[in-house]
Amino acid sequence: MNCHYFKNQTSNRPLYFNSRRVPFNEAQTLIKKILPDAGFTSAYETISKWPGYQPTSLINLDNVADALGVKSVFYKNEAERFGLKSFKALGGAYAVHKCLEMLIGKNHVSDHKSPKIKKMIAGITVTSATDGNHGKSVAWGAKMFGCKCVIFIHEKVSKNREYALKKYGAQVVRAGKNYDESVKIAQEKAKENDWHVISDTSYAGYSTIPKHVMNGYEVMIYGAVIKQRVRPTHVFLQTGVGSLAAGVTASLFRNLDYSPRIILVDPENADCWVQSIKHQEPVACEGSLENLSLIHI
C-alpha cells in the first residue's frame, strides 16, 4: 500500500495518507467481493433477534464540535451493549453462532435451548486469543449458546481483563509474550484438541470466521448511523488487528451513497498498521500494552 507522509503540525505524531484510495463505486465493489451483502443481511437478521438487542447510543458532543468549529461530533457508545462494557460485543459472539451453524446446522442452533440440542452443543469447544474485548464477546456468545470456551491471553494482559473473561464462563489460559504468540498457541491447541478457533485475525487458510466477525461489527454501525440517517463526513476508528475498522468501513460503504473519510488510529509503540503501510507488507510489532489505540475526546 502506497502512502504519503505528512508531519502533524499540532503534535509530534506522524500522519499517513493512503495514496491508493479508490473511487467510491470501486470501493463498494471491492468490499462486496470480500464481504457480500448476504453476509451482512444474515448478521443483522440474527443479531437483532438476540435477547436484549437494541441499537446503542450515538452521543452528540456539542461542546467538542463548538471547540473544533465543526457542525457535529458524535461518539459511538458501545459500553451498554448486552452489559458487556465492550466496543467489540457483536463480532465474536456472532462468529460463535456461525461456527455452530456450520457444525450442527442452522435450525439446530435456533433451537439451542432444547435438551437434545443443548447436549449436542455442550460437546463443542470454541477458542480464541485475545487482549480482552474480542475474547469477552466469544466467551459471552459461548455462554449464550451453551458451548465450552477456552481463551488464551498473553502475559501482559491485566488481571481485570482475565477476571472479566472468567465471568462469562471461559477457561482462561495465559500463554505467550504477546498477542501474536497467543494466536499461534490457540491454533496449536485447537488442532490438538479438536476445538474451533474464533479469531478476528485472518491468516493463510483461515478467513471465513474473521469475515463473520466483521459482519457482526457491521451491525453495530448500521443500527446507530445508517438507520438513524446520520451522514458522517469523517469517521475515526482504532485499528487493533483491523477487523472492527474493516467491518465499520464496510457497513458505511455498503449503505451510504457517498464516501466518508476513514481515519485509523494506531498506538505509537505498537503501530503495526503504520509500519505495514510504510513497508508495503504486513509487519509484526511488539509494543507495550500501555500504549492503546484510543481516541481521546
Model-found features: residue ranges?
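PLP-dependent amino-acid enzyme catalytic core
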Residues: 1-295
